[in-house]
Amino acid sequence: IVGGQEATPHTWVHQVALFI
């Protein structure tokens, strides 16, 4: 996860959505 925030479900889902 890019950033200093906690790896919340919504955060990693958003990251994966941007990654694919």
UniProtKB/Swiss-Prot annotation:
It catalyses: Hydrolysis of proteins, with broad specificity for peptide bonds. Native collagen is cleaved about 75% of the length of the molecule from the N-terminus. Low activity on small molecule substrates of both trypsin and chymotrypsin. Keywords: Collagen degradation, Hydrolase, Protease, Serine protease. GO terms for biological process: collagen catabolic process; proteolysis. Belongs to the peptidase S1 family. Residues 1-20 form the Peptidase S1 domain. Its EC number is 3.4.21.32. This is Collagenolytic protease 25 kDa II/III. It is an enzyme of class 3 (hydrolase). It comes from Chionoecetes opilio. GO terms for molecular function: serine-type peptidase activity. This enzyme is a serine protease capable of degrading the native triple helix of collagen. The lineage of its organism: Eukaryota, Metazoa, Ecdysozoa, Arthropoda, Crustacea.
